[in-house]
Amino acid sequence: MSDFLDHPARIRQGEELDLTKLDPYLREHFPNEAGSLQVRQYPSGHSNLTYSLQLGAREVVLRRPPFGSKVKSAHDMSREYRVLSKLHAVYSPAPEVLLYCGDDEVLGAPFYLMQPIHGIILRHRLPPGLEFPAETARRLSESFIENLIRLHRMDYQAAGLSDLGKPEGYLERQVRGWTDRYFAAKTHDYPEAQKIAAWMQEHLPVTACTSLIHNDYKYDNLILDSQDITKIVGLLDWEMCTIGDPLTDLGTALAYWIDATDPEEMQHLRWGPTTQPGSFTRAEIVQYYARQTGCDTSQIAFYLTFARFKLAVIVQQIYYRYHQGLTTDKRFASMPERVQLLLRASWECAQTQHI
């Protein structure tokens, strides 16, 4: 399956790196590498930007905040680097980081370097020519949720990550914070937004347990083994990880997971091959998680409501940068439609309690 490996591409206009400063910086820290510096960009991300750097025989990956970012807390490179520097040893899918640079003089923003993880990333459309039977899709669904459970069971205190977040009052702060972020980045009037915010405040569940949570767990953040796509070898995009209620992580995974029986408009929100024959449904994911962990998932509809609202806010924040002229990436122009879809889906879940 090596033909389906994820590869970097040409750098998007407006997201070029200043090689006159990056090149000498790299040679200072990797003095034994000869040859010219080659830079390409991984094209899929909408948040932090990811580049492939080839310096002689050495390949590294560079992560930096988006250009024109308004939301600094969502792009804290030093925090992400610190988490990964402790996490990789106890949770192998986390990338191995190499170097952090907090000097804005180099690239205009902090960044860090990490080892590349080669493999297959599955997105809303399978790579042309990649097919797998229903039993593989089912095993992949199991691996998807088992890997999340593995993360939630990880002893974050032993890993030195106790100070990463404040679990007390986590869910209440999240609801309040994401509500504030939505209205700070608001560009259109969607009546569902205020209704959802009020409903969540009135229906906050009591948090039963605490764990390290990724906060953006979905297929296109997973790297799969090129020889066995049911084996997860990497988990990317840790900028929102924290200590909190693990059911918020499960809710996020469900928000990205579109069932084959969902309405046609919901199919536009699919972030992975979740409608492949043999794949779990959202209900099966919840059942599997509850069976393996013993967690009470009776209020999972709240967590899905919140997760869909949170995704709407994230998309709205990205669109806000485009709306304000802070980025020219044309992919962002149609994002209000996605915001509206997510808000409608969130409100429907709140009203029906159906996942």
Range-by-range predicted roles:
Residues 288, 292-299, 310-355:
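Helical subdomain adjoining the active site within ATP-dependent kinase catalytic cores
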Residues 165-166, 296-307:
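All-alpha amphipathic helical-bundle segments outside canonical DNA-binding/catalytic cores
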Residues 248-293, 307-325:
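Active-site activation/catalytic loop segments of kinase-like enzymes and analogous catalytic loops
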